[in-house]
Regions:
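Transmembrane-helix motifs of polytopic, lipid-linked glycan transferases
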Residues: 93-114
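Hydrophobic/aromatic-rich transmembrane helices and adjacent perimembrane loops
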Residues: 137, 311-338
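Signature aromatic-anchored transmembrane alpha helix within multi-pass, membrane-resident enzymes
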Residues: 289, 333-361
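Short acidic/glycine- and proline-prone juxtamembrane loop motifs at membrane-interface regions
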Residues: 95, 135-145
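Transmembrane-lumen/periplasm boundary regions of multi-pass, lipid-linked membrane glycan transferases
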Residues: 176, 185-289, 304-311
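Short periplasmic/luminal acceptor-recognition loop of GT-C membrane glycosyltransferases, typified by
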Residues: 189, 360-444, 450-466
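Extracytosolic helix-loop segments that constitute the early lumenal/periplasmic catalytic or substrate-binding loops
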Residues: 24-27, 42-65, 71-75, 79, ...
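Membrane-interface transmembrane helices that cradle and orient dolichyl/undecaprenyl
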Residues: 112, 117, 153-169, 177, ...
């Protein structure tokens, strides 16, 4: 064990050091760069509209109701925008802070489950050094927030052994996960139920049923309101989204049965250097038959199964299982390596990590996604008045990332044109004066053919205003 007389070698010292380093490492780099378009800018567009309109219930995207996800992330972002202003940095702050909270909570849960503060520190270090997790703490997306609420629900669940009141807390955090990401939140009741069976625990049924109601009611009320307001319009739009993302047919059809192998392959490629230790942790728990720790295996398997069953397969959907993998890695590391070597490793790793974090904080990596969008969006906004729309056409390709960035960095709704026929129809209707098009389309369809004024050009895009 660590020398209790040497505060610098105690688990509490490392917990504090890693807590400080991770909050710096997560917050400092996001002050630079912009927002990727497809997901990040889409969520923030909804949050920006909440602030501008003052309407927190009727969430809007590009002038239409937003039916994709429940709105908890957008509500959080809108709250930050209301206090700190609308900017790229503020849009990313909620994910960074909740990512930091996830690192802190995983240390607590690992210590509670194993009874070993060293393993709490190791789990914290494993999660904070998982490149894929760290990447998404800098993104204005739902993945890290839902991971935090997922972990918080499981922390509360672990405390139900001590007090039945924690059932309600577990239900509340489950509700937050459901209101952030929808489908993946349903993994939590499954995990709780399987843990009761495997651990042979008798639930307090009154509290358990109340917790289930607390978990489901906010989501049910949200969708009931959408159905009541929009009726068949909601069903049609949401069914199309579910078909596209979750339950639709795959091509080729045999891919319906390959999700498990695809995710295992993605983890095998990316979860380094912790993968061998996570496997060792799984083996240690199974061999030791420690029922208290089986919840980690249930957690990982249930999230994996739900992700594998869906149509859309991206490794970030597995992030709610990363805290479980981190604790498994800590258990495996403690089982394979003598504690004195772990102590020396932490003593060496902490200053190295501190130098790396400070270097990143001072010289953050800067990434700009489609940098030509910002000047084009600003020019299109300046050339129009409130209530006018801007037509957007980029070779007829479904470039929703560019449209989302136009909405985020500009101040006008977009008419997204997806075919040459739609472009011709918009030009002939003359209901929109400002068009943003790709340079090739400008050369063949606008230049020398249509009376217009070039407002701005950047990269492969040209912004024009039609002349009367």
């Amino acid at each position: 064990m660590f020398d209790r007389q040497a505060k610098a070698l105690s688990p509490s010292f490392y917990f504090g050091a890693f807590a400080v380093l991770t909050v710096i490492g997560f917050l400092a780099p996001i002050r630079v760069g912009d927002l990727p378009g497809y997901d990040d800018a889409r969520y923030t567009v909804v949050a920006k509209q909440i602030v501008l309109s003052g309407d927190w219930l009727n969430t809007q995207y590009n002038g239409a109701p937003d039916f994709e996800h429940p709105p908890l992330l957008e509500w959080i972002q809108a709250a930050f925008f209301s206090v700190f202003g609308i900017s790229d940095f503020v849009a990313k702050v909620p994910s960074a802070l909740l990512g930091w909270g996830t690192v802190l909570l995983v240390a607590w849960l690992a210590r509670r489950l194993t009874g070993d503060p060293i393993q709490g520190v190791l789990a914290m270090f494993a999660l904070a050094s998982s490149a894929y997790f760290v990447k998404y703490t800098a993104r204005a997306m739902t993945d890290v927030p839902v991971t935090f609420f997922f972990l918080a629900a499981l922390c509360a669940w672990s405390l139900t052994e001590d007090s039945a009141g924690w059932y309600l807390a577990a239900g509340a955090f489950t509700a937050m996960a459901l209101m952030t990401r929808g489908l993946i939140g349903f993994a939590l009741p499954a995990i709780f139920g399987l843990d009761l069976i495997v651990a042979r625990r008798r639930p307090r049924w009154g509290y358990a049923l109340a917790a289930l109601a607390v978990a489901i009611l906010p989501l049910a009320l949200w969708y009931w309101r959408l159905i009541d307001h929009y009726g068949q319009v909601f069903f049609t739009a949401h069914e199309a989204w579910l078909d596209r993302e979750a339950f639709g047919t795959l091509s080729p059809s045999w891919r319906r049965y390959t999700g498990l192998f695809e995710y295992m392959f993605m983890l095998a490629k990316s979860y380094w250097p912790w993968l061998p230790f996570a496997i060792a942790g799984i083996v240690t728990i199974i061999r030791g038959r420690q029922r208290r720790l089986f919840v980690l295996l249930i957690w990982f398997v249930v999230v994996l199964a739900m992700c594998a069953a869906a149509k859309s397969r991206v490794l970030r959907y597995m992030l709610p299982a990363y805290p479980a993998l981190s604790i498994l890695s800590a258990i495996g590391l403690a089982a394979l390596i003598p504690v004195r070597f772990i102590q020396r490793g932490l003593l060496f790793a902490t200053p190295v990590l501190a130098v790396a974090v400070l270097a990143i904080a001072i010289f953050p990596p800067v990434t700009y996604h489609v940098p030509e969008i910002r000047p084009i969006a600003s020019a299109a906004t300046a050339a129009t008045t409130s209530g006018e729309r801007v037509a957007f056409y980029d070779q007829g390709a479904p470039l929703y990332d560019e449209v989302n960035q136009m909405l985020w960095y500009g101040g006008r709704e977009i008419l997204f044109l997806l075919s040459p026929g739609e472009l011709e129809q918009a030009l002939q209707a003359r209901q929109i004066d400002v068009f943003v098009v790709d340079d090739a389309t400008y050369q063949t369809r606008f230049k020398s053919r249509i009376a217009h004024e070039v407002i701005a050009g950047a990269g492969h895009l040209v912004c024009v205003r039609l002349s009367l």
